[in-house]
Amino acid sequence: MSGSALFNTGNVWLNPASIAQNSSLTTSLFYSPSPFQLPQLSHFGLTTIKNFDRMNFAAGFTSFGFSLYRETVFSFTAATMFTESFGAGINVHANHLSIQSYGSATTTVVDLGTIISPIENFNIGFSLNNIGRSSFGADDDIPQIFITGFSYMVMEKTTIAVDIVHDVRYSTGYRAGIEFSPHEIIVIRAGTQSEQSQLYGGIGIKIFSFQIDYGIATHTELGLTNSIGITFSN
């Protein structure tokens, strides 16, 4: 489940502190072949996370678009737990934009994040994406985003997460989700966000060291988006 207050390796793009508690070699990939039923918007990502003593490091890659327009991001993340209840991390991205017939551009983007656990089963996360307001040349073509998140494990098998998201270009919005595990190998997820009134659903299945995730998003005007993810932990 996504959320800036969750210690979850899949959330490293939201909050670099999310990998601070990772203790194993973890590799994950996701693929959305046709967002909003448009193959030109295909999105792919791959991340590997490794623990070294008290530090966790991650290297990642994402690609969005098609041959005429493509955004590619190479990322490096470092995170650690300073205390049992406080973790922090940093992302450094190399963002590359290529537009056929117009050329290409590259810039560096830095994200900072923390996660605090003031009481058992309750986390608060803070992250600032694109702290230096980097761009490809036009103002705000790479957004600066402030996220404040909360997560609470209501019961042993149920977690609720809420993010308050402020993109400096727009009004403040929210994301909310719930994750329920009816069995040790199955996870069911649902969520919503204020932007574009989207609804989300998904399921994850754990098989030995692998977890396979499927997600679907609905948009009131643009239709469905399907995505799949695979995570390996050793």
Locate predicted features.
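Subset of outer-membrane beta-barrel
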Residues: 1-234
